[in-house]
């Protein structure tokens, strides 16, 4: 990994460390959210299509989380970031690697995903390496601490681990090339 890629990740981790848990966007008792790798480390915005999709499928008593990870008001999530496919791919590869092997990033996952433990129900739509992020979080969390009602829809998932908790409703959708 190049020096600039490493420094970008260090800057990203410093931003994650500085975020206040009190500013989490995961405050509702029932949440619907996207979780994916990050194609842009400075912004956690969803595309207008992703946000519209969530709003269209959102059950009446659920709240849409209008951000990707880290799901925090203090992290930019409203500005649309334009990223080339090549740069997005490189960023997602970096994210995947750090999810598995960077203990500081794994601690950030715990810190920023742990508000889900307070939710009555969560529906998480994992795109790409989002399933890898989720399985890493759940492994570090321990099965005895699993959120009560967790539903996962994995779209074109990329994950080192298989999500096989009996208490999780899982739907995997993948194309012939996934």
For the regions a protein language model found, what residue spans apply to each?
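Intrinsically disordered, low-complexity regions
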Residues: 6-16, 54, 90, 127, ...
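Active-site catalytic motif of lipid deacylating hydrolases and related acyltransferases
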Residues: 2-12, 18-119
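Serine-dependent carboxylesterase/thioesterase catalytic core
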Residues: 104-178
């Amino acid at each position: 990994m190049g020096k600039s890629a490493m420094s970008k990740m260090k800057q990203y981790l410093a931003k994650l460390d500085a975020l206040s848990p009190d500013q989490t966007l995961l405050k509702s008792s029932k949440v619907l959210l996207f979780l994916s790798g990050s194609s842009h480390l400075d912004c956690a915005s969803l595309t207008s299509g992703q946000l519209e999709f969530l709003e269209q499928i959102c059950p009446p008593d659920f709240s849409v989380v209008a951000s990707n990870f880290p799901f925090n008001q203090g992290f930019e999530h409203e500005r649309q970031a334009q990223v080339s496919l090549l740069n997005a791919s490189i960023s997602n590869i970096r994210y995947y690697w750090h999810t598995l092997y960077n203990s500081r990033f794994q601690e950030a996952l715990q810190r920023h995903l742990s508000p889900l433990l307070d939710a009555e129900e969560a529906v998480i739509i994992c795109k790409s390496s989002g399933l890898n992020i989720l399985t890493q979080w759940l492994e570090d969390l321990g099965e005895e601490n699993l959120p009560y009602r967790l539903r996962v829809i994995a779209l074109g998932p990329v994950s080192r681990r298989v999500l096989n908790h009996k208490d999780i409703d899982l739907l995997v959708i993948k194309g012939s090339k996934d």
